[in-house]
A protein has these predicted regions:
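Sec-dependent signal peptide recognition
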Residues: 2-10
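C-terminal motif of bacterial Sec signal peptides marking the signal peptidase cleavage site
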Residues: 15-17
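Bacterial signal peptide processing site
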Residues: 19-22
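Post-signal-peptide N-terminal segment of Sec-exported extracytoplasmic proteins
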Residues: 40-69
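Noncatalytic modules at the cell exterior or secretory-pathway interfaces
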Residues: 50-57, 116-132
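Short acidic/polar inter-strand loop motif in beta-rich domains
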Residues: 63-64, 107-109, 116-118, 130-141
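An anionic, turn-rich surface loop/hairpin at beta-sheet edges
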Residues: 87-117
Length: 154
């Protein structure tokens, strides 16, 4: 029993420490693992203090996702901020292997979209939309956004 309690305590400490690594992290699960072109994914983030932040686009797909890369648009509005930019997220490398972190048949890819961006304290709305020719992207589990202090400041 003491061993279980000790293990649980360690896990809780590690999990609570992870929360301090980012200012905001949001993932939206996609119904039927399909991301339709008109399905804009929206995230509401709060920045607790003005400063420099890195903004990442998060993309989780299932093994079998057929595209080498995916084109997405990130639109971010907040206090004195209006940002609208398209990005290409690499999915499959030149060696024909999936990029990112894989676990069995699930793959997580992240793209640094905004680096050392000064964000003011306050509420932000972030929209992600895919810009692929294909209307419905299959085998997409989740898309998301992470905002964190630049790695050099952590």
């Amino acid at each position: 029993m003491k061993k279980l309690l000790k293990s649980t305590t360690i896990c809780l400490l590690l999990l609570s420490a992870c929360d301090g690594l980012w200012e905001y992290r949001g993932l939206n699960e996609l119904a039927k693992m399909t991301w339709s072109k008109g399905d804009v994914q929206t995230f509401d983030a709060t920045i607790s203090e003005t400063g420099e932040y890195d903004v990442y686009i998060l993309f989780r797909h299932v093994h079998g996702f057929p595209y080498k890369d995916i084109n997405v648009n990130l639109n971010m509005t907040g206090p004195s901020t209006l940002y609208d930019q398209s990005y290409t997220i690499p999915i499959i490398g030149d060696d024909k292997e999936y990029l990112g972190e894989g676990s069995v048949d699930i793959w997580d890819v992240e793209l640094l979209a905004m680096e050392n961006e000064t964000l003011a304290e306050g509420a932000y709305t972030i929209n992600l939309q895919h810009e692929m020719v294909t209307e419905d992207l299959q085998l997409v589990m989740e898309v998301g956004v992470r905002i964190q202090k630049p790695k050099s400041e952590e």
